[in-house]
Amino acid sequence: MTYEDVSLIPLTTISSKRIFLSGEGTFFTKQVIIESIAPKMITFHLYIKKEDTPMCIATMQKRRSIRKFVKKPVEGEKIDMLIEAALRSPSSRGLNPWEFIVVTEKGLLEKLSKAKPNGSEFLQNAPLGIVVCGNPEESDTWIEDTSIASMSFLLAAESIGLGGCWIQIRDRMHDYVITSEAYIREILHIPEKIRIESIIALGYAVESIPPRTKEELQYEKIYLNFYEKTYKL
């Protein structure tokens, strides 16, 4: 990989880790930025290197479930980005049966962290939770569609420097009597007709988790044309 010295680059998107160059079709890794700022123009002096891996694939490679968060709120701009990403998710017949509740109040996050005995407690330390709901009256594939939207939140979070973790709610129990859905429904005043698929805990990670190596991936579960024929890389 070779580095290039580039100045006065028109930028369409800037994140904490990556930039996209207007007129180009390649994503780059940022090395040095901001040389000077004028009233109507920002001059960037960058050393950049081209990446062989497409940005979307790189995001998937890096994404890990994050359960420990820094005590820092997620900026409104980033919350807007997450919501837009989820709203752009595909759905069966374009019916979009999802509804999202953005939770930032610490007291509510603490209550939601008790939605089930295990696997949700870390939500109390997250600065942001997205309750992913679906309307069965709008689509019989609401489970699939809200699951796709849940993943959109997680991938978008990774791409803008946040970490996150899926908390399964549907078909889980708060205790021996009350379902996790019923528990959350009462706290957040969710109508009976609306189902709850998941909660996505989001925030800035305390520490990064190394990506899984390619050797760790379960390629033995991949087949070619027929179930008994293993797919060879």
Q: What are the residue ranges of the model-derived segments?
A:
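A cross-taxon signal for low-complexity, glycine/charged-rich
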Residues: 24-25, 31
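Acidic, surface-exposed loops and disordered segments
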Residues: 25, 36-37, 42-233
